[in-house]
Amino acid sequence: MALKEIVEQTVAGLGYDLVEIERSAGGLLRITIDLPWVPGTAGSEAEQFVTVEDCEKVTRQLLFALEVDGVDYKRLEVSSPGIDRPLRHGQDFERFVGREIDVTLKAPIGAAAGALVNATRKKFRGTLERTQSSNGESGVVPGWQIVWSDAPEVKPGQRVSKKRLPAPLQALGFTLDELKEARLAPIVSFKGRGAKAGTEPNLD
């Protein structure tokens, strides 16, 4: 049985979601897990996080499963996603609609950039939104975009004129196939990992 299949079955069997599998130098096998998400429950209750006990439970079961299948590794590490959780699947994007995320495109934005964005740019930060697009015979299919504003950061003690116009909102639509990487923006908040996005500056 392939490594990914072993890990997915073990993690799911214990009631968790598999986020990431990484093999590092020195034989380290790193597994990242998260608590499962039920569609339609976002914001209905306080967000819960993976605990040390959760990681220990998954570690014990994985040690047994990997030994049975003869997987070659030196050390196993099971951890929670952290504040910069990777987004890899459609369900991940559904889960974090309304959150601030960082995306890296496989190719520069090019002609779609318009006048306000550098055409060679590939990295963006903005609030994740769900859109819909037409796909021929398939009809309407889910799509995604991030929205941001390039408003200058207000320094402590700085007065902002009431006459200053707000910076225009910008949007970037994308499909998952166009992404090289996507992660939750690592913004520390006392409201938890899923705190609603603000107007943080986007990445160059």
Swiss-Prot record:
One of its GO terms (cellular component) is cytosol. The keyword Electron transport does not apply. Pfam families: RimP_N. Transmembrane segments: none annotated. Disulfide bonds: none annotated. Keywords: Cytoplasm, Ribosome biogenesis. One of its GO terms (biological process) is ribosomal small subunit assembly. SUPFAM superfamilies: YhbC-like, C-terminal domain (SSF74942), YhbC-like, N-terminal domain (SSF75420). The keyword Signal does not apply. It is found in: Cytoplasm. InterPro entries: Ribosome_maturation_RimP, RimP_C, RimP_C_sf, RimP_N, RimP_N_sf. CDD domains: YlxS_C. Required for maturation of 30S ribosomal subunits. PANTHER family: RIBOSOME MATURATION FACTOR RIMP (PTHR33867:SF1). HAMAP family: RimP. Belongs to the RimP family. This is Ribosome maturation factor RimP. It comes from Albidiferax ferrireducens (strain ATCC BAA-621 / DSM 15236 / T118) (Rhodoferax ferrireducens). The lineage of its organism: Bacteria, Pseudomonadati, Pseudomonadota, Betaproteobacteria, Burkholderiales.
